[in-house]
Amino acid sequence: DTKYALGSVLNHVLLHQTIIGTEAMAQLEMANDYPDVIVGCTGGGSNFAGIAFPFLGAQLRGGKKVRIVAVEPSACPSLTRGRYAYDFGDTAHLTPLTKMHTLGSTFTPPGFHAGGLRYHGMAPLVSHIKELGLIEAVGYQQLQCFEAGVQFARAEGIVPAPEANHAVKGAIDEAIRCREEGVSRAILFNLCGHGHFDMQAYIDYFGGKLQDLDYDEAELAMALAGLPSVKAA
């Protein structure tokens, strides 16, 4: 007998991950600080929700307003280019149908190095708050994210995972925006993983073997055409 448990996309997984943001709030309280902007990378949504949801919850209960930015790969842009529709949360179609931003459960993203972000659909709760306008979403190409990761490693002595490079790139862009606007903002981002097991990706980057990848429009259209038909009750 086999049981199938997803580690992302489903809402209960997001709930468990909120320990990340809860701990971040406690740490910031110790530092007597609070973020103006929160940046997180997104694939299925668990890491992003983990850092963002506690702060969003505080905001909705009357707390300080924060800008929340979800960063995803341009090659797998479920939030920025996907359709808000009912779909399966997995390619095997074992999950319940949930309403999400999706590229279609049969969509196969190109093989870029941030494997944890190669997911066709976004968690229902993350999708819902995007529809409500509570978060923003932006897509980045692979090479600019690796460039940001190298910059971070040289400055901080920590090599980020390719997935985390997306959040690093988003945070750097927010800092540049502050400089251009002449304002000071506290920027919080989640470095969700180290790159110790991704050295080959960095070797390929420095060797000029990586390239920016885009999704196939025809394949995306075919995947979206196969979305389940759901009739309203």
Map each language-model feature to its residues.
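Active-site/ligand-binding loops adjacent to catalytic centers
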Residues: 1-14, 20, 31-32, 57-60, ...
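Conserved PLP-enzyme active-site core in the AAT-like
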Residues: 17-21, 48-49, 53
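Buried hydrophobic packing segments
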Residues: 25-27, 51-55, 149, 167-175
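C-terminal, active-site-flanking charged/polar segments
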Residues: 67, 188, 192-201, 205-206
